[in-house]
Amino acid sequence: MNIMPMGNMKWMFHRGTPFHINGIFDPRNVASICGQYNSAVQVGMYDDCNIIYVFFHPYAMKMITGIPCHLFEDKNISMDDLGIPAFQLLKRMVLDAESDEKAIAYIEDFIIRQLAYRDRDSHLKQLMFVCDEINKHSFATLNQLADKACLSERQLRRIFLDNVGLSPKLMLRTRRCLRASKMIQDMTTKDFTQLTFELGFTDHSHMYKEFKQFAGMSPSEYFDHVNEIRRHHLIKGYKAYHG
């Protein structure tokens, strides 16, 4: 199953058998922090799969871990490897919880305590504003975002890499291709003309090149892939994962 980059970081807790990622199966990595990915990943699930995902706003992860987000880029790091006892304890509590509901309650309580413990970044409001602008406007440029945030482009890039894990330019491209994937998920025919126009790609060739870089397949191939997921009655969960 093809999982698109989304522009935000997440936690994964495997209360069943972990899935394999890009053909690699690591049974030890049952609780992890997933950094920002620059291209799609292929995952394979087992029958006893039981995963709790925790998705974060793009600017939120450093507020909880205290670790610069760019260090997680293209990585899926075990909570055991962070060297932070609180995360190691969280892992044990979540995996040993008597129910998913209890596990989720442990996670929520942990996040609240971490947020109360750590200082917020002085640029938090600007980060929130820029992330919101990126979500709303496919046509936004780096210069426009920096101007609206009252920052230089260099400042914005530095703050983004530290707190989001991507450059603002890469975030723009990631979100645009994610929106393209959502539109394709709802299509009934392979007509990508409207998609190209609505999302601000210069032409079909530009859209094809960008989409293939992030999705690992062409728009047409992705359309077929989504229909295969639909035939296996997994489309509801797939669409929910991608927001």
Model-derived regions: residue spans:
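Alpha-helical DNA-contacting segments of helix-turn-helix folds
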Residues: D121-K125, E133-I134, F160, V164-I184, ...
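Alpha-helical bundle regulatory/interaction domains
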Residues: M1-M128, E133-H137, T141-N143, A149-E153, ...
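Basic/polar phosphate-binding segments, predominantly the helix-turn-helix DNA-binding elements
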Residues: N143-L172, T196-S218
